[in-house]
UniProtKB/Swiss-Prot annotation:
Protein name listed in UniProt: Na(+)/H(+) antiporter NhaA
Catalytic reaction equation(s): Na(+)(in) + 2 H(+)(out) = Na(+)(out) + 2 H(+)(in)
Compartments (UniProt record): Cell inner membrane
Gene Ontology biological process terms, A to Z: regulation of pH
Keywords: Antiport, Cell inner membrane, Cell membrane, Ion transport, Membrane, Sodium, Sodium transport, Transmembrane, Transmembrane helix, Transport
GO cellular component: plasma membrane
MF-aspect GO terms: sodium:proton antiporter activity
Length: 386
């Protein structure tokens, strides 16, 4: 049974099921879907609010765990020179899509679409990991390179959401951020007191942080990102990203272990709440997002990684330029975070729906990457041509 559950999580089945359910529902009975998503669901709160503003706080918290662990001595981002090439590639994976999006928008788009520049900066960690494993094999160095890139991408994405996509209706109210600062101070004190359960950090640090962001009209889904680094953890990391250390019983490790399965299956809710767009909603912004993900990602990542080589920061051993090219294509799968940003970038439901469709269509990058790998003679690790 456990093996089947892990298989469902590994292939992101809950998220895909939520997306497909939302697409069918929104196209067959759009009024019913809209009513379910935006009417009262939990008391006065809508299903969309519960999903995007409360549940997604735990999604971003899991990303924050990986970033925190990766920065520890022995982690994938430590020492920094080991991570410089993938980090430079990450910068290219942001600059490239933004450049392609804005350039195409100036040629064939509209000023109404400009705010969507942040959508194609995201890389979906789960789908990128799955695609890389299927193309390269389980232990290929591309896996670690791509995961590090995706995690760093998420960190940049969090900054983009927080800084560039505040509430479009209500102005930012900075004084309320004192609540978030208070939550961080409480978490710091709990750590100094060596509190070993993660629950006090969530309740006494996370809740004020959430309300502070909410009242400041910034996105409360980022609330736990400010708290997670305070959870006690080992002074040294002995595993790679998304692996588990059976000897690590720290609050940080327990939080990830106990909440990751909830988040993985809860992504059904996210897909259901955010992917319900009509196929008729597709317009120019759909293709701006899709093309920026497909062409901008691979171009930016490839060029910046090669620049890193020229500066003396080589690719990981066993990873060549053809592997880099395919990794750049895989990174064009935006999906989860791209859907989230699309919901924040546009208030017009027609434009928002079209942008979300571009994020959903980015899953088509997967077969493009597989075809490119075949053309370049790449096989799963263990074959002589890999």
């Amino acid at each position: 049974m456990l093996k089947r559950i892990n298989l469902l999580r590994e292939f992101s089945i809950p998220l895909l099921a939520g997306v497909l359910t939302a697409l069918v529902w929104a196209n067959v009975a759009p009024d019913s879907y809209h009513k379910f998503n935006h009417d009262h669901f939990l008391g006065p709160l809508s299903f969309h609010f519960v999903t995007n503003d409360i549940f997604m706080a735990f999604f971003f918290a899991i990303a924050a765990v990986e970033i925190t662990q990766s920065c520890l001595p022995g982690g994938d981002m430590s020492p920094l020179n080991k991570a410089l090439n993938p980090l430079l590639a990450t910068a290219g994976g942001v600059v490239g899509p933004v450049g392609v999006y804005l350039a195409l928008n100036s040629l064939v788009g509209s000023s109404a679409f400009t705010n969507g520049w942040g959508i194609p900066t995201a890389t979906d960690i789960a789908f990128a990991w799955l695609a890389a494993r299927l193309i390269f094999g389980k232990n290929h160095p591309v896996i670690a390179f791509l995961l590090l890139l995706a995690i760093a991408d998420d960190a940049i994405g969090l900054v983009i959401i927080a800084v560039f996509y505040p509430d479009p209706v209500l102005p930012v109210a900075p004084p309320w951020l004192m609540l978030t600062a208070a939550g961080m101070l409480i978490a710091f004190i709990l750590r100094r007191k060596q509190v070993k359960s993660y629950w006090p950090y969530l309740l006494f640090g996370g809740v004020p942080s959430w309300f502070g962001l909410f009242k400041a009209h910034l996105h409360p889904a980022l609330a736990l990102v400010f708290i997670i680094p305070f959870l006690p953890h080992p002074t040294r990391e002995v595993k790679h990203m998304f692996e588990e250390d059976p000897k690590d019983y720290s609050p940080l490790a327990r939080f990830e272990h106990e909440w990751k399965i909830i988040v993985d299956f809860g992504l059904f809710m996210f897909g259901l709440a955010n992917a319900g767009v009509g196929f008729s909603a597709m317009n120019t912004v759909t293709w701006l997002v899709f093309c920026a993900l497909l062409f901008g990602k691979v171009t930016g990542i490839f060029v910046f990684a090669l620049l890193g080589e020229k500066l003396g920061f080589p690719l990981p051993q066993g990873m060549g330029r053809r592997h880099l090219l395919v990794a750049g294509i895989i990174a064009g799968i935006g999906f989860t975070v791209a859907l989230f940003v699309a919901g924040e970038a546009f208030t017009d439901p027609v434009v928002q729906g079209a942008a979300k469709m571009g994020a959903i269509l980015s899953i088509a990058v997967f077969p493009v990457a597989m075809a490119a790998a075949k053309l370049l003679g790449i096989r799963k690790r263990g074959h002589s041509s890999s």
